[in-house]
Amino acid sequence: MKVVITGGGGFLGSMLCEALLKVGELTAPSGNRQRIESIELLDAVFPKLSVDPRVTRKVCEISDREAVFDAVGTDADVAIFHLASMVSGECELRFDDALRVNLDGGRNIFDAARAAARTTDELPRVIFASSIACFGGDVIADSFADSSKQLPRTTYGMTKTICELMINDYSRKRFFDGRSARLPTVIVRPGKPNAAASSWASGMFREPLAGIDCPLPIRRDQRHPMTGYRTVIASLIALHELPESLLGGDRAVGLPAHQVTPQLAQQVLAEIAVEHDLRIGKIVDAYDDRIQGIVNGWATAIDGSRAIQLGLPQPPPVKEIVKQYLKDFASV
């Protein structure tokens, strides 16, 4: 079977590709396990060449409907992992582009999967990387579960919510078998800060570990749901493999997360500095009203009990997540 990964040139997309190559097979629309014959990565840019002959790269935007349909193809034996998206900070500044990429692009993916379906009994599986930005409100609840009302306070969250609802309805109508993974903020991302309003979450670990001071645009007591990238990759694959009957009509599953503050990050960094004999940079207060305002509208805690009941993995302790980053990306 074929796998298509949108956002395949990004951090999570490239890691998912590597994980799938190691797994080697997935459940096909027939319900049987099939060997992964090829993986097609879609993205606007790719940082490095692929060395595995099973992997091809297509430079395109998901708003290009023809390119998306060409990549997905007409064979129902395809698994689609839809990770491509404009990030939260960009969406707030570029509303029309957010609609073009996140909504129009999402519909292109969904319609291509629908067109590839063989019968209503053998449907391509579509795994969508959604976000806890679907939640919000004037008053933030103590915790948000899969049953909580979605009231996003950002354009990014709005587009994710709409795509979740589309996946529910396309699945109800038997156009494809869709599942949405509602991701907490993923740490620790290697490289440089990006335009996401949550970029500080990785930065407050990544930069100090490299001996660099990190500007912090939010309050030090700000609580925020976070999980590790290894857990997210394992969860995306596990969600793909779940029997459809376990999901019912609600296809969006919120992944478990730790409630992390910059204060906790500072404590974890201090412990790791001692254990690994590292010179740690500082987390420096650099308060930004715009970023704090966005974060104020986000969930501070996630109830991931449904995901756990479905057998999806829980994240290891925050300290272990940071150690995984050091092991995987110490030279980055």
Regions found by a protein language model. Name each.
Residues R107-T154:
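Conserved Rossmann-fold NAD(P)-dependent oxidoreductase catalytic core, especially the SDR/UDP-sugar
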Residues N168-R223, Y229-A234:
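NAD(P)-dependent short-chain dehydrogenase/reductase
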Residues Y287, A299-Q309, P316-V332:
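Amphipathic terminal alpha-helices
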Residues G137-I140, L151-R179:
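Active-site Tyr-X1-5-Lys
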Residues I62-V101:
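NAD(P)H-binding glycine-rich loop region in Rossmannoid oxidoreductase-like domains
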Residues L49-D64:
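Rossmann-fold cofactor-recognition segment
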Residues K2-L26:
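N-terminal Rossmann NAD(P)H-binding glycine-rich loop of SDR-like oxidoreductase domains
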Residues P208, T231-S235, L239-I291:
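Mid/C-terminal beta-alpha module of Rossmann-like enzyme folds, strongest
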